């Protein structure tokens, strides 16, 4: 066993290609175990509220419908762009965090503020780089037919009908959301790690396990807090990504709802959802998201630190 290190805070000691590769590994690992939950979450976010049922029954209803009408493989629709999204996002997030950490360290910011700022910059960078894959994944997951959609055909359709902006629909809102998420996640993560480091020597021996548990849960706690705060913004972004789809009327029984979004920006769509569906609609899929956040964040940070440990041997 090796002693776990905080490679993010010590990123200036890690080569850029190692942080890039470790981030890709962590992203792919996280994606591989959460794809089905991700699909259900996106389906719930894309479906306007109509006599909302309890959160738990919503999840089961969507899952049963997918198995009955589309088959078990439906849970992995959009898996290719989803995997590319996670790999690209993971690589960009961790490598840019390490890079920004290196260049901002000389400014001598207070440790928690430093983590918050670096996390925000890392979030913006990773969002821009990976966003087209996010749009593709949302469009493919929205397909509720038995047959799968062609990725290349969807790319051509977006390019033909919407142009380059189509691949970045909702990206400004996404950068705001993801920047906030990254800031909260990394800020919480580093705050807990710093707290544990500072109290390690003064903590009584019989309470060491509590500190160790908190230390190992830092990434998960940060991910959960960030998800709860930013989930409504993510729901609005999903609606924006799907609203101009060529297959909107074919894949959704609520095309008129999406039609009412035409010409609206992020804030107006959010207000429209609040007015027509209520605040609970902005949290459709939150239980799935939180269930996904725990393994995703844990595997992401664990995978990154583990990969960095072994890459340092070479």
From Swiss-Prot:
It holds the Pfam family Mito_carr. The keyword Transport applies. Its main location: mitochondrion. Keywords: Membrane, Mitochondrion, Mitochondrion inner membrane, Repeat, Transmembrane, Transmembrane helix, Transport. It is a multi-pass membrane protein. InterPro entries: Mit_carrier, Mitochondrial_sb/sol_carrier, Mt_carrier_dom_sf. One of its GO terms (cellular component) is mitochondrial inner membrane. It comes from the Eukaryota. The chain crosses the membrane at residues 14-30, 84-100, 116-136, 170-186, 217-233, 285-302. Induction: Expression is regulated by carbon source, with very low expression with succinate, acetate, ethanol or pyruvate as carbon source. Mitochondrial transporter that mediates uptake of thiamine pyrophosphate (ThPP) into mitochondria. Belongs to the mitochondrial carrier (TC 2.A.29) family. This is Mitochondrial thiamine pyrophosphate carrier 1. It comes from Saccharomyces cerevisiae (strain YJM789). The gene is TPC1.
